[in-house]
Amino acid sequence: VGGGGKTTLLYAMASHCAQKGWRVLVSTTTHILRPENGLWAKTDAEIQELWARGSYAVVGSPAPKGKLTAPPEADLAHWMAQADAVFLEADGAKHFPCKAPAEQEPVLLPQSNIVLAVAGLSALGHPLKECCFRLEQACMLLDVPPEACLTPELLAQLLASEQGGRKRVGSRAFYAVLNQADTPQR
């Protein structure tokens, strides 16, 4: 959940686990970019073929703009039961490095036992109105105006809040992931 490179992180983690010989499934409960590397599987046979090749399999129903949406619930449950590891993207951020969840977000499945809240460090030092998806919710949660610059403290508050990164986590394991740390300043 969150912003700042969820999909990239998801695919990197899936690749890492697949390289260990695990049967890895990637999907979404909302929308995700369709992979361009031939890893989108539409049938049981395609999933098994990808796993046999030592790759991960991405499942989902076609959606506009090169995306996938959640596959039918019964299909997803069937495929999840066959996998050693499952990675699900559970909300969207429109490519913003940070976000606050909407009323209906995140869409976590009961089977999910770990939640990662992702934020991009590229947002630090920028006004919320420039770097945060669902600006109104973020401003209310943080009690700051849209012009307020995102500080490490505000980002931590956003990630740790039960109305922010920890929303709907409940008793699941929770980790905050700070990415986009690819410059000396970050």
Summary of predicted features, one role per range:
Residues 1, 24-28, 58-61, 86-90, ...:
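General beta-strand structural signal in soluble alpha/beta enzymes
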Residues 1-14, 18:
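Glycine-rich phosphate-binding P-loop
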Residues 14-66:
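N-terminal phosphate/diphosphate-binding loop that engages ATP/GTP or pyrophosphate donors
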Residues 44-47, 133-149:
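Acidic, Ser/Thr-rich peripheral helices and adjacent loops at domain boundaries
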Residues 61-100, 105:
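Phosphate-binding/switch loop-helix module in NTP-utilizing enzymes
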Residues 90, 120-121, 141-147, 158-161, ...:
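G-domain G4 guanine-recognition motif of GTPases
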Residues 102-124, 141:
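Inter-motif core of Ras-like GTPase G domains
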Residues 148-168:
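A short, acidic, amphipathic alpha-helical segment used as a generic capping/interface helix at domain edges
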